[in-house]
Amino acid sequence: MKITMIEAFPFDLRYKPTRDFLVSYGVIDEMRNAIVRVTTDDGVVGYGELMPLPLDNRDACIEDLKNIGKAVIGQDPYEIRELHARMDEQLSAELPSQELLLKGAIDSALYDIMGRAAGLPVYKLLGGSYNDGVPMHFSISIGSPEEMGADTAARVAEGFRTIEVKLGRFQGELDLDTEIARIAAIRESAGPDVVIVADPNIGWTVEEAIDVLPAMEEFGIYIEQPVKGLDDLEKVHRAIRSPLIADESAANTRVLAEIIQRDAADMINLKILRTGGLYEACKMLDMCEAFDIGYRHDNVIQSRLASTMMIHFSTTYQASIPDCGGTQFTRTIEDIVNDDEGVYMDGGTAKLYDPDAPGMGATPKPELLRDPIPIAG
């Protein structure tokens, strides 16, 4: 079996007209991603999802995908190690996240092909087992303490046992007392047993983080990458007692090795598309387990297609915080996956409609696959 063609299909998904989803770097009100389809000479097809970075940079990312895509044409999709080496030759030496996201889209399609060809779900290829679903977290948008507390109460009532709280400056403004009030309101609404992960999305300075985090300790939180860069993350880690999670700084095995060597964080937040796909993600979590570094599963801005692959991966590795990201698809009006395929939400738990379906078990709706953009082949 050989890879013969790669195509991309852009799609736009609008967010539901509820309270705006605000994070420290702006407002997210739509998803402008692309489906990536990889075809083989045996007729087996696999799908991945491309999230552009920056989020409004889809057209340029699709063009960049052509450089990576041509490296795998004519190759056996089962030779995943060789295919990643070929794709890596097309990447910059510093491995920026936007390039790893391109590789992650193709990687997901390759694993989908392998599963479909073998007649096995992807989680079995990875050595995992499906145990009736994966607990998910839900992200609470930046807002007033009252708004965020109300949002938290609603999500806990739905069955979510982990809440990720968006913090950080928005539109250039930051008030540390308000940040503390937000966490206090969320803990009060969530109760004592819900896990709270505070995520400023690198929206604080080192000084702000060291100033505000001691005041949040009483609320029993985890703190996810409050500052930009590994040097600053290490400074914060040495100054606080709350468990610190590396996110933006934990993009690949090379950086993870540095995090471990420098003791720059207690845990990492792993997003399979951002790491370059399942192949690299598995290596990263094997490293975490070998060096006793905690980890949690999370998502980028992705549809139900990529979230389905995330569930396959999450059944393979038991995270330190028993939750997974991937609920962004619940915020969109439209959907790109066929009904009764892939992942769905049952309260705060993500489940697969058919856990025995080969590959990812999810196929994009036919109407989204009518106008392909040729990538390679």
Regions found by a protein language model. Name each.
Residues 1-47, 51-53, 332-338:
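Structured beta-strand/loop patches that form or line metal/cofactor-binding pockets in enzymes
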Residues 5, 39-117:
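Metal- or metallocofactor-binding catalytic centers and their adjacent structured scaffolds
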Residues 94, 228-243, 251-351:
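Shared catalytic-loop signature of beta/alpha-barrel
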Residues 127, 132-240:
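Metal-dependent enolase-superfamily TIM-barrel catalytic cores that perform enediolate-based chemistry
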Residues 357-377:
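Extended hydrophobic packing segments that form well-structured cores
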